[in-house]
């Protein structure tokens, strides 16, 4: 794929975003699970000499939750996630426009001039969105393969763009929408199961079937599950990706017979649809902290 030959700054930004995403989810999961562990330790008691084992479990739960909270506050991984993704997507869009002759890099523009403009635009993106981020590579120039594809005929550039940009992204949107739908359904089922168990346990204690009160624990489990569902945004992202996939089908049809004199602006319009999706995704991301 041509994207493998994009400037290394694109891959650096993509790596930063992936690491930020992983850390955000791991620390958020640790915080939520630790809260449940602390609630469980607070609800039960088991004395060994002068020590209460469950009280120590609660202590460990609170300490783990505190650690996760501090790490989320100081490291701000969600900031690297969103900023890195924004930079990567903006550079990807710019690289595709350069490669296939989209605005502001029409095929009629001399290669040397297009290269300089591309590097300047990439530098602007990094300067605007990359504050506090460390990039391992300083290469922000259009690569040899990008330049080589740029010199090909309109039909070749069109086919490359339709196959490797539009079709690939449409497939990714479609697959992601289905995955988010499945995950949302599974998680909703788990939450409903947890709520039913909580009702049974509360009813059993209310009618004197047992004396153990773990309704607080079940409440913590349900609340943590709801918080995790809110963080992952399964339903909202499913709708966003489904809409984007349907929109790209229309874009693909529009690009099929565009002549050279309209090609640059048509590619810009297509890339604008990706920008809108990324903006919607950014707006859907809640703060982990």
Report residues per predicted region.
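Conserved non-transmembrane functional hotspots
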Residues: 1-196, 200-289
């Amino acid at each position: 794929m041509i994207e493998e030959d994009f400037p290394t700054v694109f891959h650096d930004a993509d790596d930063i975003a992936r690491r930020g995403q992983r850390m955000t989810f791991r620390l958020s999961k640790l915080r939520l699970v630790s809260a449940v562990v602390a609630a469980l330790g607070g609800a039960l008691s088991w004395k060994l000499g002068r020590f209460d084992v469950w009280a120590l479990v609660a202590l460990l739960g609170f300490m783990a939750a505190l650690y996760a909270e501090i790490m989320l506050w100081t490291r701000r991984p969600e900031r690297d996630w969103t900023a890195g993704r924004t930079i990567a997507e903006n550079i990807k869009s710019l690289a595709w426009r350069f490669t296939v002759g989209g605005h502001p890099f029409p095929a009629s523009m001399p290669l040397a001039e297009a290269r300089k403009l591309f590097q300047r635009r990439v530098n602007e993106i990094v300067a605007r969105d990359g504050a506090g981020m460390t990039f391992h590579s300083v290469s922000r120039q259009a690569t040899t393969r990008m330049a080589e594809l740029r010199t090909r005929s309109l039909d070749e550039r069109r086919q490359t763009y339709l196959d490797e940009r539009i079709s690939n992204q449409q497939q990714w949107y479609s697959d992601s929408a289905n995955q988010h739908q499945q995950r949302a359904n599974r998680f909703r089922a788990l939450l409903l199961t947890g709520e039913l168990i909580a009702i049974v346990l509360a009813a059993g204690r209310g009618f004197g079937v047992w004396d153990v009160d773990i309704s607080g624990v079940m409440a913590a489990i349900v609340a943590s599950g709801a918080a995790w569902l809110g963080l992952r945004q399964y339903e909202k992202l499913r709708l966003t990706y489904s809409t984007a996939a349907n929109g790209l089908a229309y874009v693909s049809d529009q690009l099929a017979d565009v002549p050279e004199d309209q090609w640059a602006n048509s590619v810009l319009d297509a890339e604008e649809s990706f920008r809108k999706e990324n903006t919607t995704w950014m707006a859907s991301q809640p703060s982990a902290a």
